[in-house]
Regions:
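Linker/hinge segments immediately adjacent to helix-turn-helix/homeobox DNA-binding domains
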Residues: 151-162, 196-213, 241, 246, ...
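Terminal helix-turn-helix DNA-binding modules in bacterial transcription factors
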Residues: 229, 260-301, 320-340
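Short coil/turn motifs that cap or connect alpha-helices
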Residues: 250, 265, 298, 313-316
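Amphipathic alpha-helical segments enriched in hydrophobic/aromatic residues interleaved with Lys/Arg
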Residues: 146-198
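Basic, amphipathic alpha-helical hairpins
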Residues: 179-192, 201-213, 223-238, 257-258, ...
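N-terminal regulatory/effector-sensing and dimerization cores
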Residues: 32-151
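Append "Primarily bacterial transcriptional regulators
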Residues: 241-250, 254, 258, 291-298, ...
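Short Lys/Arg-enriched alpha/beta "domain-start" segment
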Residues: 1-34
Length: 340
């Protein structure tokens, strides 16, 4: 995507190739720049993807600094302040618009074309963000993102007025996914853009479960929907404690409430979803090792054990069953669609 912003550092900042500070989260294959003054150090990491432009700024500040920022067009941003001794503040020069970037609170922004100032307080700070393709929020998928409608429309219409969403929590699951994305970027492989898009969609999906909006969706339905998303993304690596952490409820509470409504535990539902995921994956792969990796298992042995425990079949028999069913896991015994 096109980078739509730039900034001008004060004259005392010099570009350096051997900075005195080390990055907390290096991004694989990113474009990296460092600047230093007598008192401060700033690092930029960026990666230009097809569906999103990734940026990362780390600040080591002995003195507060204000940096002018210029945007050449209105764009939709997703931001994650991963570290901050005190909030960073960005404001428009002429509009009544300001946003504070506080540790652990993410936000979506529409930054209109114009001039801004970013005030960076004394201390250590990390700000990560993505410039997003607003086309990701097309109907019907956008029905889950009502809190973004005004920003998506502002982007499409190139509104002259900047705006922001409510903030959302940035917890351990989000941080782990960001670090995973940082480690996997590789423009030299064919499916790099697919990987980036998959990771970005997961982060976007995850953000909506952190926002307490209209309360129309019951907690257990939120838990089931989040589990479905995480199984597709992480497979067997999904921990129910992560679901509980995102929704700020105990694992035992979610398990019991699920059992009351659906007559099976949340853990049972997790296994049903995972088996369904395996059933739809295994027929397309020649090697079980590929299926194990794509479905989040640490080894073929672990995949074999799971299939055997859930169906009584060997992986080979299970795969044959899916192929005989015309690649339709809904009609295969032992891989039935989880109850909705």
């Amino acid at each position: 995507m096109e980078r739509s912003y730039d900034f001008v550092l004060p004259q005392e900042y010099e570009p350096v190739t051997s900075p005195i500070q080390r990055l907390t989260y290096p991004i694989r294959n990113a474009q990296v720049q460092h600047w230093q003054s007598v008192h401060n150090c700033i690092c930029e990491q960026t990666f230009d993807g097809r569906y999103g432009y990734l940026y990362y700024y780390e600040f080591w500040m002995e003195h507060e600094e204000t940096i002018p920022i210029y945007t050449s067009m209105g764009d939709l941003h997703l931001t994650y302040p991963l570290l901050s001794d005190s909030p960073l503040r960005q404001s428009h020069y002429t509009q009544d618009f300001a946003i504070e970037f506080s540790k652990g609170r993410g936000a979506y922004l529409y930054l209109a074309k114009g001039e801004y100032r970013l005030t960076i307080p004394k201390g250590r700070h990390i700000l990560v963000g993505f410039i997003l393709d607003a086309g990701l929020f097309r109907p019907p998928a956008n029905r889950h993102f009502g809190f973004l409608d005004h920003l998506v429309q502002a982007k499409k219409n190139q509104s002259p007025q900047s705006d922001k969403s409510v903030t959302f929590r940035v917890g351990d699951v989000t941080k782990q996914q960001l670090q995973l994305l940082f480690s996997k970027i590789n423009p030299n492989i064919l499916d790099n853009e697919h990987m980036l898009l998959k990771q970005l969609i997961f982060l976007i999906q995850l953000s909506r479960f952190k926002i307490q909006d209209d309360g129309k969706e019951e907690l257990i339905e939120q838990a089931r929907n989040l589990l479905q998303i995480m199984i597709l993304h992480q497979g067997a690596q999904v921990r129910l404690s992560d679901i509980a952490g995102v929704l700020r409820k105990s694992r035992d509470y979610i398990n019991e409430e699920h059992k009351k409504k659906y007559k099976c535990t949340f853990h049972d539902y997790r296994n049903q979803l995972l088996l369904h995921h395996i059933a739809s994956t295994i027929v397309g792969n020649e090697k079980l090792a590929t299926t194990a990796e794509e479905c989040g298992f640490s080894s073929v042995i672990e995949l074999n054990k799971f299939i055997k425990n859930q169906t009584g079949l060997t992986p080979g028999s299970f795969k044959q069953q899916q192929e005989n069913a015309g690649n339709d896991p809904l009609s295969a015994r032992g891989a039935q669609e989880p109850p909705s």
